[in-house]
Design a protein with these regions (language model features):
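Intrinsically disordered, low-complexity regulatory regions
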Residues: 2-176
Length: 176
């Protein structure tokens, strides 16, 4: 268990969507990586301290996380087009797992800002969080297919994951 209870709750929610042991193992690994990195990156003692760093520049942490999600999505969109990476040290599988974790972390950061907002913004936030959980699910599913050497399903789940960029951008624009 991490010090971020909402992260733990969300990982558990996504685990319940899977019966495949490979997917469960990927989610366990994601949680272990998050816990280790959260400890290494969070000098403040707060969960997700590195993601909060952008607040020093007046950028909300969840928006900073959205930028990181955008970086990972750009990399994966290029992978879909080129079918390879020039930087060999990072595989597409690593990128989708990073993306899945960033999606969960952004959902955690949105959870923190929900209470002071109106019902309208609360509804928007819940839709964004649902999109983020689905994004994470599709990323884990794609990683599972790759680990199981399933070539029959191709990259359909990666494409589904990438389809969540537009609604997340719409949420960001609406939350101005």
């Amino acid at each position: 268990m991490s010090r971020n209870k909402f992260y733990d709750k969300t990982i558990f929610q996504i685990k319940r969507m899977f019966t495949d042991e490979t997917a469960i193992s990927i989610l366990d690994n994601m949680q272990a990586v998050y816990e280790a990195k959260d400890s290494d990156y969070s000098a403040t003692g707060l969960p997700m301290g590195n993601l909060r760093k952008c607040e020093d520049a007046g950028i909300e942490a969840w928006r900073g996380c959205l930028v990181r999600i955008g970086d990972k999505m750009s990399r994966l969109e290029n992978f879909l087009k080129e079918k390879e990476y020039l930087v060999i040290s990072e595989k597409a599988e690593d990128t989708v797992i990073d993306l899945a974790n960033y999606a969960i972390l952004m959902s955690c950061l949105i959870e923190e800002i929900k209470p002071p907002h109106s019902d309208y913004y609360l509804n928007l936030s819940e839709k964004a969080q649902e999109s983020l959980v689905n994004l994470s699910y599709y990323c884990v599913f794609q990683a599972m297919l790759w680990k199981n050497n399933d070539t029959e399903n191709g990259l359909v789940f990666l494409e589904k994951a990438l389809s969540h960029w537009k609604p997340l951008c719409e949420y960001s624009l609406e939350m101005q």
